[in-house]
Amino acid sequence: MPSFDIVSEVDKQEIRNAVDQLNKEVSARFDFKGSDARAEQTDYELYLFADDEFKLGQVMDILIAKFTKREIDVRCLDKGQVEKISGNKVKQKITVKTGVESDLARKIVKLIKDSKLKVQASIQGEVVRVTGAKRDVLQEVIQLVKGGITELPLQFRNFRD
């Protein structure tokens, strides 16, 4: 029986490259001269630092541009609250969402079941596995999920015949 997995993954090395490019650009830009604006990464968490909220917004815009240039979908970014740290400086935590969360996985399974296609969808941790009798039906499911789910970037992996 043919099957495939629906996942949401982000390449950690591409995130690191985007953050490095952001830090290079911020250090070279004239409007950030003398500023302590920067970005730091720990696994799938990013921390943006700046002198004030306006500059933090500019750093965020640069981050989005660098992610887009490296073909990382910005829908996977979960922005936290802006926190004040020593003096006027501000910090913002950004989490990069990976894996299909259980609520979204249930929504995907419900979408597939409501379509009345002859496939079985099951949730396996942070992956949704779809199994069907024919490849054509599985390709219809891929198109259905691509059109119906827009909250998170999804990839279709592990296609087996």
Swiss-Prot record:
<protein>
    <recommendedName>
        <fullName>Nucleotide-binding protein Neut_0623</fullName>
    </recommendedName>
</protein>
<dbReference type="Pfam" id="PF04461">
    <property type="entry name" value="DUF520"/>
</dbReference>
<dbReference type="GO" id="GO:0000166">
    <property type="term" value="F:nucleotide binding"/>
</dbReference>
<dbReference type="InterPro" id="IPR035570">
    <property type="entry name" value="UPF0234_N"/>
</dbReference>
<dbReference type="InterPro" id="IPR035571">
    <property type="entry name" value="UPF0234-like_C"/>
</dbReference>
<dbReference type="InterPro" id="IPR007551">
    <property type="entry name" value="DUF520"/>
</dbReference>
<dbReference type="GO" id="GO:0005829">
    <property type="term" value="C:cytosol"/>
</dbReference>
<comment type="similarity">
    <text>Belongs to the YajQ family.</text>
</comment>
<dbReference type="InterPro" id="IPR036183">
    <property type="entry name" value="YajQ-like_sf"/>
</dbReference>
<comment type="function">
    <text>Nucleotide-binding protein.</text>
</comment>
<keyword id="KW-0547">Nucleotide-binding</keyword>
